[in-house]
Amino acid sequence: MADLPETPAFGAAFSDEEEAARALEAGRWLFSQTCSFVMGCVSLDTLPDHDLSEIAFAGRSNVGKSSLVNALTGRKTLARTSNTPGRTQELNYFRLGPEAQDPALMMVDLPGYGFAEAPKDAVKRWTRLIMAYLRGRPALRRVCLLIDSRHGIKENDRDVMRMLDEAAVSYQIVLTKADKLKAAEITDVLARVVAETAKHVAAHPDVIVTSSQSGAGIDLLRAQLAALASP
Ligand SMILES: Nc1nc2c(ncn2[C@@H]2O[C@H](COP(=O)(O)OP(=O)(O)OP(=O)(O)O)[C@@H](O)[C@H]2O)c(=O)[nH]1
Ligand SMILES: [Mg+2]
């Protein structure tokens, strides 16, 4: 992945090289701290009470949400991953940061939307839950909306983007599985996704290209998310 194109985030997110270096260091530091599973939630009334910022990882089933949580935290089995779409079936909370000390973040690994190899009723139930959570969670500071770089933005992703625009919930597009594409294909999908994202009011202008497998883009995403940590 050495020839991954530089994502626009690098230029736009930081005003100069010094600021970029500081942000990257802060991201590496925070994501090297303790990260522990807090709880899995199957309904809105069981979401945890806390005073940290929440970052949610949303996207179609199998796009690589749980793998991204593992890559960010440098842990292989923190969040359970699988080849079978529909692996994650609860809102899984992970607390990142030093114990009883700031800065810290709550990361929420969501079930996927779209096709899943699970009973229809279960898929319907968790899809309703994800949408209600995304629309109405005050602690939610940023949604990382994951898009498989081989497929680009699909119609059900657009539905979620429109819903987040209407609810004024800040979200950032993260392209996943970049290791599966050639550099020219990544440049192409990135251009299309950036152009479409620019039309959405609640979308962060920077689109980050990642691979949980090769580690591409992971440090950059760490830097951006660490900036949202509480306090
Ligand atoms: N090549 C490659 N495979 C990946 C990458 N990220 C995830 N995968 C694979 O994609 C599959 C799905 O990954 P998960 O992380 O379980 O995806 P998910 O979005 O959490 O899936 P659900 O919980 O079922 O919605 C697994 O087989 C992963 O190994 C990546 O960056 N590169
Ligand atoms: Mg998952």
Curated annotation (Swiss-Prot):
Which cofactor does the UniProt annotation name?
Answer: Mg(2+)
Q: Name one GO biological process term.
A: division septum assembly
Q: Does the keyword Ubl conjugation apply?
A: no
Q: Which Pfam families match?
A: MMR_HSR1
Task: Supply the gene name.
Answer: engB
Q: What function does this protein fulfil?
A: Necessary for normal cell division and for the maintenance of normal septation.
Sequence positions that bind Mg(2+): S66, T88
What are the protein's UniProt keywords?
Cell cycle, Cell division, GTP-binding, Magnesium, Metal-binding, Nucleotide-binding, Septation
| Gene Ontology cellular-component terms listed | cytosol
What is the source species?
Rhodospirillum rubrum (strain ATCC 11170 / ATH 1.1.1 / DSM 467 / LMG 4362 / NCIMB 8255 / S1)
- Every copy of the EngB-type G domain together lies at 51-231
Look up keyword DNA repair and say if it applies. no
Q: What Gene3D superfamilies does UniProt report for this protein, alphabetically?
A: P-loop containing nucleotide triphosphate hydrolases
Where along this sequence does the record place binding of GTP? 59-66, 86-90, 109-112, 176-179, 210-212
* Alphabetical list of HAMAP family matching this protein: GTPase_EngB
Q: Which family does it belong to?
A: Belongs to the TRAFAC class TrmE-Era-EngA-EngB-Septin-like GTPase superfamily. EngB GTPase family.
Instruction: Tell me which InterPro entries the record gives.
Output: G_ENGB_dom, GTP-bd, GTP-bd_ribosome_bio_YsxC, P-loop_NTPase
GO terms for MF:
GTP binding; metal ion binding
PANTHER family registered for this protein in UniProt: ENGB-TYPE G DOMAIN-CONTAINING PROTEIN, MSS1/TRME-RELATED GTP-BINDING PROTEIN
Q: What is this protein called?
A: Probable GTP-binding protein EngB
